[in-house]
C-alpha cells in the first residue's frame, strides 16, 4: 500500500480522470457485447471496474500499483469495514477471473 502524496486538487483531477476512463471503458464493453465479442467485453468490464475502484481508493488517499493490490485494498478498506456491500467485492473478483480466462 502506498499513501498518495497528491494535493487535494491533483487528487480530484486523478479521480475524475479515472472515473471518465472507467465510463469510456464500460462503453467499450457495451459495444463489444453488441458485436458479439464476449471475451473483449469481459476484459473491458473488468478494467472499467478496476479504474472505478482505483479512483475510489485514490479519493481516500490510497494507491496501489497492481491488479491484485487494488482487489486486496478494496477488500481491506471498504468491504471488511462494511462501507461497501460485500457483493460488489464478489462481482469485482468474478470480473477479474473472467478477464484472466478471456485474455489467457
Could you tell me what each predicted segment is?
Residues 1-104:
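Terminal alpha-helical segments
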Amino acid at each position: 500500500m502506498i499513501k498518495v502524496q497528491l494535493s487535494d486538487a491533483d487528487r480530484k483531477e486523478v479521480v475524475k480522470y479515472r472515473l471518465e476512463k472507467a465510463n469510456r471503458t464500460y462503453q467499450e464493453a457495451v459495444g463489444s457485447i453488441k458485436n458479439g465479442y464476449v471475451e473483449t467485453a469481459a476484459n473491458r468490464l473488468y478494467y472499467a471496474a478496476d479504474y472505478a475502484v482505483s479512483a475510489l481508493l485514490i479519493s481516500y488517499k490510497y494507491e496501489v500499483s497492481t491488479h491484485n493490490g487494488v482487489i486486496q485494498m478494496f477488500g481491506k478498506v471498504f468491504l471488511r469495514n462494511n462501507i461497501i456491500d460485500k457483493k460488489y467485492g464478489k462481482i469485482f473478483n468474478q470480473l477479474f477471473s473472467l478477464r484472466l480466462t478471456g485474455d489467457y
